[in-house]
Amino acid sequence: LEEAVLGKTRCDDLPGAQVPERYFTYLKTGEFALLEDVLRHNFDDIQSLAELTAVICSAYRQPELLRYEQDILSVGKTLLHGRRTQQARNCLKILGHSTLAPQAHLYLASSYKQGREWTEAAELWKTMIAKGEGGAWPYIELAKYYEHVQHDYDIALRYATSALQYLLN
């Protein structure tokens, strides 16, 4: 993780798996020199955790600066789970024209539905259908929307039928 995210490589580091053995040997022998490598290893761990925390905080403050689309999607999902809805939506919208747009649209539309922001949800479901995203899901959601929110049963039936046709093909 240190190398992949922080670009740091440890030199002459005590492997973490050896730490318990060194510590227990120290307890038996009282030889403090055995702990020097352990303490350096732990210090490096703590320093790296602080640096990783700064990287993560930066990712949440400015997700648009993240290098990988998957990281942006992950930040958006985490913000949704943390009920930071507007920040999550802004984050997911960054992915609007990316290869992860279909997944981002699923989460974004679900967020609108959960917030009872029906116009935004319905428009996004229609966009998903137009782009061939989401499988039968946007058809099903639109069928429920037209049945339960708009009370337009003819349109609801059309979307339900389209969902069924999609699933049968």
Briefly describe each language-model feature range.
Residues 1-169:
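DEDD superfamily 3′-5′ metal-dependent exonuclease/proofreading module
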